[in-house]
């Protein structure tokens, strides 16, 4: 089950460029059956390999990569400002929290796809109703190639009328929201299919 509750309820900087150490990158090894709830297995990629895959990204996407794994202030206002800056590029916004078990299972899928498609698609996180220390610990264990906006009061969650986390919002290159997926992605193929259907140029 994913975490749900009523709608009315209310830096760790691991930048990609210049990191010499190997960072743990959890890759989703999915079960054969669609919708499997099994947690993904883990492996590692070096920072150099991540940088190689993301090298040459357009400036707005490269700016995201430079803020990899950071938790930024701003909540909904910060997210809206970033989406405006990303106009011209499709975007995927993942709403997560450290206290959310399904988010922990889904994050490796987000991480892998954000590396595979990070030169064409923008990825942004929203850390909802979380404890900062818990959130940074979460990201230390499952580092991602993009920043998350801290949203302690659940502004984005409430504005989107979501019913649980994780949830993922899709935007086309014009900045129009095209789809909302409520619930986790446990399989890479499912996330990629939705990106191609709802967000990709």
Give the label of every model feature segment.
Residues 89-91, 96-99, 164:
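Short pre-active-site segment immediately N-terminal to redox-active cysteine/selenocysteine motifs
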Residues 95-112:
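Conserved redox-active cysteine motifs that mediate thiol-disulfide chemistry
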Residues 1-73, 201:
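N-terminal targeting signals for export/organelle localization
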Residues 11, 137-145, 150-201:
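Thiol/disulfide oxidoreductase modules built on the thioredoxin-like
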Residues 67-91:
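A short beta-strand-turn-helix
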Residues 65-66, 105, 115-153, 165:
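Conserved segment of the thioredoxin-like fold in thiol-based oxidoreductases
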Residues 92-93, 123, 168:
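Hydrophobic beta-strand anchors of alpha/beta hydrolase catalytic cores
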Residues 87-89, 119, 162:
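Active-site acidic short loop of glycosyltransferases
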């Amino acid at each position: 089950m994913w975490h749900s509750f009523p709608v009315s309820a209310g830096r760790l900087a691991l930048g990609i460029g210049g990191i010499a150490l190997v960072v743990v990158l959890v890759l989703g090894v999915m079960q054969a059956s669609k919708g499997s709830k099994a947690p993904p297995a883990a492996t590692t990629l070096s920072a150099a390999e991540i940088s190689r895959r993301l090298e040459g990204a357009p400036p707005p996407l490269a700016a995201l990569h430079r803020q990899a794994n950071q938790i930024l202030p701003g909540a909904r206002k910060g997210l809206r400002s970033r989406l405006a800056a990303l106009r011209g590029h499709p975007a995927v916004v993942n709403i997560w929290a450290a206290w959310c078990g399904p988010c922990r299972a889904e994050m490796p899928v987000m991480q892998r796809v954000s590396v595979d498609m990070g030169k064409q698609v923008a990825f942004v996180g929203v850390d909802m109703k979380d404890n900062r220390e818990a959130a940074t610990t979460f990201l230390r264990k499952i580092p991602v190639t993009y920043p998350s906006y801290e949203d302690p009061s659940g502004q984005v969650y409430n504005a989107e009328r979501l019913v649980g986390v994780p949830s993922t919002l899709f935007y086309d290159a014009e900045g129009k929201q095209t789809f909302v997926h409520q619930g986790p992605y446990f399989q890479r193929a499912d996330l990629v299919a939705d990106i191609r259907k709802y967000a990709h140029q």
